[in-house]
Amino acid sequence: DYGKAQENVTVAGVPHTFAWGGGHGAIPKYHAHGIFLVIDVTAYYPSLQKQFKIGYRVMDHPENFEFIHDSNIEFKRKGDKKARQPFKIMDNAISGQMKQPQSALYDPICINGQLLLLDLVEHLEPYCKLVQNNTDGIIVKLADYDRDFEKIDDVVWEWEQRTGMKMDFDTFMGDIYQKDVNNYFLVDR
């Protein structure tokens, strides 16, 4: 059954599971102190959907989806959380329906996102330590911020150019305590 299949592999020294719901990897029971980058793709699956026209073949009016998605991104950039909320919910709901076989919007998208993030991780591997890869973003630890940040930024920029996606960067200095991919917290210095 395709929906239940999963593949367990090691990527950048981190155990990963690739399955119907996304790609997930994390160093288990990990604690470290240092400088980390939290790198997330902006509205990843809806952005993939628009960039590569995934699902358009089953939509009567894809321009309606584009309006919802573009409004979500516009309000995010303006920092207007209240105005953004309904568009964000609709944007993500549309992408979520795309992996449901009983949905009129069925057109699986998740594998596309998994492969593109895997590509990013492989290009970043020489310049940082992968801590976590979670469906729409990654956390990496920098050994030397002054030496490595610009190279990482260049790799991410090149990835954005190839994929049409946009990334959000947050630099974090402190400690990470991680049980697994969905159970972690960051503590500021």
Specify the residue positions occupied by each region the protein language model found.
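Composition- and surface-driven signal marking solvent-exposed, interaction-prone regions
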Residues: 49-53, 134-135, 152-155
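Short beta-strand
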Residues: 129-134, 169
